[in-house]
Amino acid sequence: MERINVTPRSDYKEKIEALGFDFHGDYWREEACYRFTTAEIEQLEEATREAYRMYCEAAEYIISEKPEFMERMLQIPPEICKRIRESWDQDELSLYGRFDFLLDERGVPRILEFNADTPTSLLEASVIQWQWKEECFPECDQYNGIHEGLVQSWKDIFPAGSDIHFAGALDDHEDTGTLQYLASTAMEAGFSTRVLDMNAMNLQDGLFYDPSGERIRRCFKLYPWEWMVNESPDGCLAQVEWLEPIWKLVMSNKAILSVLYELFPDSPYVLPCYLSR
């Protein structure tokens, strides 16, 4: 990986805000970029595949063999644990997640965490970075197919023509921007979408309804399962096809890193991790 100093575009703020990235603040910087070799990219791809495989094995171990870990260490109520097991056993599909890696002194990716439930930095990585690259380095390639992958995944997860609600904390600009971008990818895939605030969802008799009275059957929520478990346990059990599925609650808790190290202590991607209680 090579850090390269570059000259920022004089009008970059106007350009990225025109693409919906109006929550960039000071963290989008164009003074430098990073160049990877093909071998480094292939190593990251392999590390990501292997990391997700290990996370799935760790989740299976916790959900199927160590359910007391969910209640005791993750502090998940028994009725929610039961729903997690059902969700996992039914292979409820996931849309996406984000691994955070560091590169050690040998250049080997090491897992810091898996943002399994409410990952952001999505619009930036898929659209904004691409526009910058095309304008500044058109001869180079971008290492990701996020946008195309999202469009295809909607088709793989939900029946054609479905209505999909997108819910989150709309008073947060980053969450709103992420939801609007995700909704646009679903629309590109041929789905009808509605974006609403989590507080606008009305729970009645185990069903959720939007402000217009329409039943919410399929919903992507950019809202942590941990919060929902605390605020609305009954809502967690409602008849909704959620993205992300509720089994992501297990993967998103950093306590799973200790299980990952227990199961895969010799993996080059896993850092030592222990629980103090």
Regions found by a protein language model. Give the residues of each.
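Preference for protein termini
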Residues: 1-277
